[in-house]
């Protein structure tokens, strides 16, 4: 959780991986010990570690940087508010260029809720496969980030070989015979 705290200090998206990573570490903890720890206590403990690490890093930044709120605005506000609409490989810039400015805040909220909704849906549906949830969410983030980079896609593509045993099961027209 400390590494997730460091990553969340730099960007918002890693914080969305908290629930699947807690599930992954909880499953690992229950396999190692004879009795399972309390789920709410385990989650609260790890959430406290995440909050403490992010708060500690933000506190250090406040001491080091003269204009702390400028740092927060440049780090988190830039990702949340999407002020730069120059063309990039992402989808958001095109949607926001085509719409009226009066609808901008509404659609910013809709886009963020859309991306965050995958966390709950995938976690509930694929509870027994938390590593797959993390991999799938990294792919979703690579597609739906406002300012994606090649490293987002490469991280997702690097995790795909973990599931190569599922490649023959993919359903595409050329690879599967038609059975009617």
Question: What are these model-derived regions, one by one?
Answer:
Residues 1-21, 137-144:
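Membrane-interface alpha helices of multi-pass inner-membrane proteins
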Residues 17, 30-33, 170:
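Short, flexible/disordered secondary-structure transition segments
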């Amino acid at each position: 959780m400390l590494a997730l705290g460091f990553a969340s200090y730099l960007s918002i998206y890693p914080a969305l991986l908290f629930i699947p990573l807690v599930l992954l570490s909880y499953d690992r903890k229950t396999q190692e010990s004879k009795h399972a720890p309390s789920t709410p206590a385990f989650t609260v403990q790890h959430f406290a570690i995440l909050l403490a690490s992010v708060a500690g890093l933000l506190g250090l930044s406040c001491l080091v940087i003269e204009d702390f709120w400028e740092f927060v605005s440049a780090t988190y506000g830039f990702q949340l508010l999407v002020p730069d609409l120059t063309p990039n490989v992402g989808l958001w810039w095109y949607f926001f260029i085509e719409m009226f400015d009066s609808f901008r805040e509404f659609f910013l909220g809709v886009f963020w809720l859309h991306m965050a909704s995958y966390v709950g849906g995938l976690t509930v549906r694929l509870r027994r496969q938390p590593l797959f949830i993390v991999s799938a969410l990294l792919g979703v983030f690579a597609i739906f980030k406002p300012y994606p980079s090649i490293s987002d896609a490469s991280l997702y593509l690097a995790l795909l070989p973990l599931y190569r045993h599922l490649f023959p099961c993919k359903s595409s027209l050329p690879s599967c015979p038609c059975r009617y």
